């Protein structure tokens, strides 16, 4: 038997060729000294020789079927007996294709075997894995998690009940019976079911009747939330709930501000604390704090400075044009006080600035700030008519509160009641 690709590189042997004894005797000879292959080397092998090229579904190459059967017996052992007519073929040798058809049948690599239950004492072997022995749809459902949230599972269980109410144990039973995936480990998903029942507003707890035996309350589905479960998917509507909560908060804050305003107008006490002042209650959360700054100027010792500032006089004069109750507030002017440009807002000559006069103009202050802060809030503080702080570490009462009221720049300053 000789080799095709040389003495050292041949892999497939060809039977019927002379042995390479002559070439092996002189390993150091150059390649030219070797005898070339003749035409007899490429001739067909004898019929009785074993052919290593085997086909499972047909005869061997270059030999009759009897030689192929002998070679197959040498490699695979004795062939199994032929199956009876109409029966399935063996796992390795498939029957030849019918005459007139093209293609060949391919044998399976492994036959599906039934799953053997693994004993709890010993772990499952390699042949007992579930993905190798998958034989039914139930086995597939045990491996794949259902594409439903826990809220959707609870809603399915409640809607499947005749009375549309179930206890917690019945919800567990429905989920485990409907979805085999949850039959494996019950600790994790049962905790999630309890959390969703407690935290989701769509599920309401109904106490059990006295004549109803058993224990545990019933759980029902809110009728308003039935449309939120579309094909098993729970659609949350958090935006509407947040908007409703914001609306109730704003309404509560408005009523509280009105009560504070009425109490502040009724009592004309100057030494009112800052937490209960009407200017603090009327201050909006999204706008600057002009009432807070006004209150701070009232409690600061720089009261006489208000009388010598023409900008403040012009500011109050612009507020007087927007005031509705100017005729009523005119009667509250005190004798011997200095006029600030707004009817009803009077400053005593002693220099003490009462918060009562500020509370009368606080409503107009808010209206003016809301109308002008959006359009003129981007202007630089360079054009502000109020001077900056020049004293030590203390800030001026006009440093920040009125910077957004830039419409004062375009007004003409009256000289009445002001000291220049």
From Swiss-Prot:
Phosphorylation promotes the transcription factor activity. Dephosphorylation by protein phosphatase 2A (PP2A) reduces its activity. Residues 294-306 have a biased composition (Polar residues). Changing residue 236 to W: In CFM2; decreased transcription factor activity; decreased localization to the nucleus. One of its GO terms (cellular component) is nucleus. GO terms for biological process: anatomical structure morphogenesis; cell differentiation; epidermal cell fate specification; hair follicle development; odontogenesis of dentin-containing tooth; otic placode development; parathyroid gland development; pharyngeal system development. SUPFAM superfamilies: Winged helix' DNA-binding domain. Changing residue 234 to L: In CFM2; decreased transcription factor activity; does not affect localization to the nucleus. The keyword Zinc does not apply. Transcription factor required for pharyngeal arch development, which is involved in hair, ear, jaw and dental development. May act as a pioneer transcription factor during pharyngeal arch development. Required for epithelial cell differentiation within the epidermis. Acts at multiple stages of otic placode induction: necessary for preplacodal ectoderm to execute an inner ear program. Required for hair follicle stem cell specification. Acts downstream of TBX1 for the formation of the thymus and parathyroid glands from the third pharyngeal pouch. PANTHER family: FORKHEAD BOX PROTEIN (PTHR11829), FORKHEAD BOX PROTEIN I3 (PTHR11829:SF310). This is Forkhead box protein I3. It comes from Homo sapiens (Human). The gene is FOXI3.
